[in-house]
């Protein structure tokens, strides 16, 4: 009987720990502030808020996705892809629902989390879509080769020329 009681307690504890958790306030607040700033076109201030969220939750996919959206808007496609790659690593562990806004050209979608969780990760789908759009954009716009500047030629004094 003791074994069954212990097993029942273990099952209750494990099922309680598997329940989706609401994002901590110290992460949620800078994410929502950053989103509002991003929507207003205040990208530097928004980046600072998203980086604050990342300092408290290193792989937060909302912060990483939004940093990717800003980087893509600024033409920094490699940076955007790097952020999205990090975001995709743990996105499935974040069941929060979100509100969204699109940038012009529809390259990347910025997302604002809400204090409501779903049964599965909604942000993972957004990240996957953003990665696909970004990779297509990168393939369509190959990098321009960087021109090289040859070194200055050595000047030969006039008396040594032709000898």
Question: What kind of region is each of these model predictions?
Answer:
Residues 24-38, 65:
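Alpha-helical tetratricopeptide repeat
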């Amino acid at each position: 009987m003791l074994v069954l009681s212990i097993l029942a307690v273990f099952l209750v504890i494990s099922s309680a720990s598997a329940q989706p958790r609401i994002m901590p306030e110290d992460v949620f607040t800078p994410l929502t502030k950053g989103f509002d700033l991003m929507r207003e076109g205040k990208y530097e201030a928004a980046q600072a808020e998203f980086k604050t969220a990342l300092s408290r939750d290193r792989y937060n996919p909302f912060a990483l996705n939004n940093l990717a959206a800003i980087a893509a808007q600024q033409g920094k496609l490699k940076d955007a892809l790097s952020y999205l790659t990090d975001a995709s690593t743990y996105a499935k562990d974040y069941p929060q629902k979100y509100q969204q806004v699109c940038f012009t050209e529809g390259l990347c979608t910025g997302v604002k989390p809400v204090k409501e969780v779903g049964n599965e990760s909604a942000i993972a789908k957004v990240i996957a879509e953003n990665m696909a759009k970004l990779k297509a954009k990168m393939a369509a716009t190959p990098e321009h080769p960087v021109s090289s500047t040859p070194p200055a030629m050595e000047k030969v004094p006039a008396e040594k020329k032709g000898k």
